[in-house]
Amino acid sequence: MRDNVERWIIHEGLQSEEVKNPENNFQILVKHAGRYGIPVDVFEPKGQPGILVIGAKVVMKNSQIARYLGFSAEEKERFEKKVNDFCNSIQVINKIITEDGKQKVGVYVVMDDKENINQQTMLDAIDDVSEKYDKTSRFLLKTF
């Protein structure tokens, strides 16, 4: 899987770098991907060989992070439910994470139809994640 993904990325002329992550068999960061030219991770989770996950992380603004960190447990739960409901409505898996001291909302598309993972479907998924990243970013600006 890794060799195919690397070859497809090179064939498309996309800039990328390998990311070390013990949770994944491999992880590649595509630096400027999709319509919006955002950084996108392409990886195969260790517990799910043959599954390809495409994801991007929306970094919350400093004012949003400060507000989020000031939330009570109940308010955080309500906020996370709002984000989750929105992401479900645009058919993307999400995860709120803290990374490099910043709150981020990861948006992910899972490619689990092993027979149909190829260069075109991966590129389509990258474009899809790029678009859903933009929608999630705008959602956060409007509602938070």
What annotation goes with each model-predicted range?
Residues 1-51:
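Charge-rich, low-complexity N-terminal segments
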